[in-house]
């Protein structure tokens, strides 16, 4: 009679991914509701879907408004990264939109990577109004390190509800909203 046996089979697989840093605008202009529920939440949803579709890549997250900081360094632990997306909100740091500073911070996070491909994905409404580094300058720095920069414009042109804090709480008014496509294309 054959006796029952069990075996432990181990399989090592090697996958080769790329390194990606997502740079996300969290300025107050991202609270405009031309996208639902607002620009920031729409950008977070797009970013989370992107992360879920890239299981073999190292992905990091930089956030910026008037200043910039690293929310998550490059990691393959996408569960941690996705949880950190939930914590992102406008008002975490000084307001304004320093696109160049956010892009430069993303470059510093990925420039020393040994990956075969290095990519920065910039999610913003593109209206740069702060920072010591111009967006085009930061993009040129990325290019010198062999880093490709892809931009995702978040928003529409026209008018949209925008939240204002009043003595009676938050009220919404229609304001002119735009997306700076010229800067994003450069």
Name each model feature, range by range.
Residues 26, 125-126:
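Residues immediately flanking
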Residues 94, 119, 126-185:
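VWA/integrin I-like adhesion module and closely mimicked acidic/polar interface patches used
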Residues 3-117, 133:
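Membrane-embedded segments
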Residues 21-23, 121, 150:
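Conserved beta-strand elements of the Class I
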């Amino acid at each position: 009679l054959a006796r029952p046996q069990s075996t432990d089979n181990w399989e090592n697989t090697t996958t080769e991914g790329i390194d990606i840093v997502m740079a996300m605008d969290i300025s107050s202009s991202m609270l405009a509701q031309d996208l639902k529920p607002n620009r920031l939440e729409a950008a977070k949803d797009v970013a989370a879907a992107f992360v879920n579709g890239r299981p073999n890549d190292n992905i990091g997250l930089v956030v910026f408004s008037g200043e910039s900081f690293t929310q998550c360094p490059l990691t393959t632990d996408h569960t941690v990264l996705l949880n950190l997306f939930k914590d992102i909100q406008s008002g975490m740091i000084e307001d304004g939109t320093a696109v160049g500073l956010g892009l430069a911070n993303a470059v510093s996070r990925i420039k020393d990577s040994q990956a075969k491909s290095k990519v920065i994905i910039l999610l913003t409404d593109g209206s740069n109004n702060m920072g010591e580094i111009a967006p085009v300058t930061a993009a040129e720095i990325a290019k010198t390190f062999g880093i490709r920069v892809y931009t995702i414009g978040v928003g529409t042109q026209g008018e949209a509800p925008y939240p204002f804090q009043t003595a009676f709480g938050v009220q919404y008014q229609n304001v002119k909203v735009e997306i700076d496509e010229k800067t994003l294309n450069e």
